[in-house]
């Protein structure tokens, strides 16, 4: 099976690096799917997006992402996020409270929204 080297890095930490069969990300131009052999591109990630990485061993890795860039080269995908959290790390009740709270600022609300989306996307097949 064809693969592409992929890395997901945020300002705080490197989240993952390895071989993937596909990468899906939400950019300011819309959702994009990257497969091995994709044309090189540079995209800006949305403030409340989700990144899905399908690894070569069949694992689906889902992260909530706030801003940053996606760079696709001939043999590599680099996702450089301002902030990223694995769906498995999300405290759902806290994220729901932040999303629904009237005293939550727009940045925190966007982060909570992307975390809840990531949890939902992780449940999908």
Curated annotation (Swiss-Prot):
The keyword Zinc does not apply. Keywords: ATP synthesis, Cell membrane, CF(1), Hydrogen ion transport, Ion transport, Membrane, Transport. GO terms for cellular component: plasma membrane; proton-transporting ATP synthase complex. It comes from the Bacteria. It is found in: Cell membrane. Its main location: membrane. Produces ATP from ADP in the presence of a proton gradient across the membrane. HAMAP family: ATP_synth_epsil_bac. This is ATP synthase epsilon chain. The gene is atpC.
